[in-house]
């Protein structure tokens, strides 16, 4: 369910009583004390994207933190700043396995990881049939688990998290560990564009909201016809999301030439651009 809230710098909070926040759109305006032109900072991308950057994936947040729109738009000519925020509360899904392998599925949506733990933080989970000596360490966690699997799963409709083949190291030798993953399913579409082509997103009368983007390769089947350079399936371009947001977010349509924009994050691998997005006020066409 999409909700709408008017925020001010004196009351900057968003909260979901259930689920987590996902900001879909932000508009802002000001009341001026004089006829002087509104400061240019009030139309800056950073000011507009602030609520989304601070709130997405959280149960509650304060928009007016350091560097927020309240700082960027502050001037002697303004008495107040109003943020018109459209957002939704998305239900979280939690899966726990003692085997170190979980399958994440989102049907028509796409996966967005919130939390991921590989280790042990209590003595009850996955304890059946295990000796007490394997359960006593409850401060055990594999560092980097969330970052690793966010890179590999975010933006996909389905994803397998397998710590058996992707474990960096053993965070606590002698402790019986489990895998605990919390994620949400974003109501998004996915655009795939193969290397050497031009990517176009079109929302008709709506505007583009980008959730995830990567230029590289995360599986062996996408854009694979007639290609042999597919063995590297962990090819990531970290700047992809920021670039796609800068070019496309808030527009009704946008076009990206892949090679000159993203460079070559993994030489010798045939790459593709994947973008998970939705259309606010319209239906996406690719």
UniProtKB/Swiss-Prot annotation:
Q: Which Gene3D superfamilies match?
A: 2.60.120.740
Q: What's in the keyword line of the UniProt record?
A: Hemagglutinin, Lectin, Repeat
Does this UniProt record's set of keywords contain ATP-binding? Answer: no
Q: Which InterPro entries match?
A: Lectin_gal-bd_dom (IPR000922), Lectin_gal-bd_sf (IPR043159)
Domain of life the protein comes from: Eukaryota
Q: What is this protein called?
A: L-rhamnose-binding lectin CSL1
Keyword Transcription recorded: no
Q: Where is the SUEL-type lectin domain?
A: 96-186, 193-280
Job of this protein: L-rhamnose binding lectin. Has hemagglutinating activity towards rabbit erythrocytes, but not human type B erythrocytes. Agglutinates E.coli K12 and B.subtilis.
Thermal dependence summary for this entry: Retains hemagglutinating activity after heating at 50 degrees Celsius for 120 minutes. Activity is abolished by heating at 80 degrees Celsius for 90 minutes.
Got a GO cellular component term for this one? extracellular space
């Amino acid at each position: 369910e999409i909700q709408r809230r008017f925020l001010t710098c004196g009351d900057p909070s968003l909260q979901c009583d259930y689920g987590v926040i996902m900001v879909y759109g932000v508009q802002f305006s000001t009341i001026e004390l004089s006829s002087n032109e509104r400061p240019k900072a009030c139309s800056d991308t950073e000011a507009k994207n602030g609520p989304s950057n601070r709130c997405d994936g959280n149960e509650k947040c304060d928009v007016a933190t350091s560097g927020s729109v309240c700082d960027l738009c502050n001037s002697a000519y303004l008495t107040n700043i109003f943020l018109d925020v459209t957002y939704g509360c998305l239900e979280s899904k939690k899966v726990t396995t003692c085997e170190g392998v979980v399958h994440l599925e989102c049907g028509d949506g796409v996966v967005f990881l919130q939390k991921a733990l590989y280790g042990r933080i209590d003595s009850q989970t996955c304890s059946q049939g295990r000796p007490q000596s394997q359960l006593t360490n409850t401060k055990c966690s594999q560092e980097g688990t969330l970052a690793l699997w966010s890179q590999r799963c975010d933006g996909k409709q389905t994803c397998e998290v397998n710590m058996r083949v992707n474990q960096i190291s053993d965070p606590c030798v002698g402790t019986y560990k489990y895998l605990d993953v919390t994620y949400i399913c974003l109501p998004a579409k996915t655009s795939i564009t193969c290397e050497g082509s031009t990517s176009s997103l079109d929302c008709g009368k709506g505007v583009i909201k980008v959730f995830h983007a990567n230029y590289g390769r995360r599986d062996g089947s996408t854009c694979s016809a007639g290609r042999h350079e597919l063995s590297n399936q962990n090819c990531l371009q970290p700047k992809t999301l920021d670039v796609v947001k800068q070019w496309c977010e808030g527009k009704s349509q946008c076009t990206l030439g892949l090679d000159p924009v993203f460079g070559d994050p993994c030489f010798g691998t045939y790459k593709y651009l994947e973008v998970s997005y939705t259309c606010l006020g319209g239906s996406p066409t690719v």
